[in-house]
């Protein structure tokens, strides 16, 4: 049992490594012209899609949700494209390359939040909401306060995630293409703004679908070539890997990377519940016509992602055999050229030559663009729909709301570029963990309880939600990553690296206590309205479908 618990604990802290995959030491590579040419082909193609989409974006619904006309299969691919990052592709395969079996457990950690979304979130979210998850949270509660809280939670998560992605983009492109870091960051920012500004959700969706297809194809080809090398025998794969790896048979044992079980559990909870609170993921469920398609979206997305993470495991072991044992991929000191995070890239060269290496490098860049486009649209919708149209200027026309959304896209893009450049040499690994912690501590409790707990009131949601958000931020600042490593203090005030275990508890307890003790007339009215909301969430009665959505 102890061994099982250790393995489960090891499955949880993936996000720190995923962030490190794009924020660690980077050795700039020679200019890769094949990769640049393939990437330019991708850019031209996706800009063509953006132009096509811009001709079909005629309303607010078209811009935010692609008119609600995306199918479950298409949306599943887009969700997978939005969630599968370059960090997971390079980082998890690098982890398998260095640590073996632990990499498989880590990769499974990516999936633990999706059953929650499938069984608890997707159907009710689609039946109750229109454009953002704040539509659901405020369905029977006070619009103003709840939308402000939801928008703040969304914007903080988007900002943290976006900074981490932009810094990672610059480092990764410097690593893969040999381009200057600043040029890479500006290029990602400009393309991101163009996709979202002109094409809205329709262009963003197709960029994510294309990226997912390319990534799945590339990873499948690499895994196929690795298995072909060992006669399609997993026994041969593991035997050959153990024979050449410095750790020998130890790479087949789990638990070698666990240092602090509390931090591991905390990060795992942040990942599990944070996935169900990520605004750019939740927004995707409004692009389909009904709850049935929303469920199908999660089903397909989970299948695609599960398949992808199995491939990264094979790729990692293939890299042990074909890259780790090949001196052509080592520098004078015997280390992997470009660092361990180049393991999958070197394997692409080993199994497919320079042309396939260029393809995989271009796919890694496309992966970043797909993720940041989704983040930007989620942030823009929080400002324009939740804050502008429903709080500060109620009754604003669709045209005014879309204008504000597009201005927000430009502002977010410029801020992302500036912060990406400013944070070039900073430790941004903590930002991914903090983004998940805030999503889990603020967004997720409010979404879940607003849909399932009849006694929830505005007072409880506001106080509990703000407590969860602030607790996550304060504990992260006082923890070892920021307080010691960044601010330079000798000892951390909060001893654990990730705060989600504590901040989620504070959020749920706060929401329960302040709702249970709310005896106001407004609170009683909100409780009475739960039955009507419940019927709507179960039946979808009154939900608009398709282009009318």
UniProtKB/Swiss-Prot annotation:
Listed GO CC annotations: plasma membrane
GO MF assignments: acetate transmembrane transporter activity; glycolate transmembrane transporter activity; symporter activity
Coiled-coil boundaries: none
UniProt keyword annotation of Cell inner membrane present: yes
Membrane topology label: Multi-pass membrane protein
Main localization (coarse): membrane
Record keywords, A-Z: Cell inner membrane, Cell membrane, Ion transport, Membrane, Sodium, Sodium transport, Symport, Transmembrane, Transmembrane helix, Transport
A Pfam family matched in the record: SSF
InterPro entries: Cation/Ac_symporter_ActP, Na/Glc_symporter_sf, Na/solute_symporter, Na/solute_symporter_CS, Sodium:Solute_Symporter
Transmembrane spans: 33-53, 77-97, 103-123, 148-168, 183-203, 206-226, 262-282, 303-323, 355-375, 404-424, 428-448, 464-484, 493-513
Database matches in HAMAP family: Acet_symport_ActP
Primary role: Transports acetate.
Membership in a protein family: Belongs to the sodium:solute symporter (SSF) (TC 2.A.21) family.
PANTHER family the record matches: CATION_ACETATE SYMPORTER ACTP, SODIUM/PROLINE SYMPORTER-RELATED
This protein's name: Cation/acetate symporter ActP
Origin species: Salmonella newport (strain SL254)
Gene encoding the protein: actP
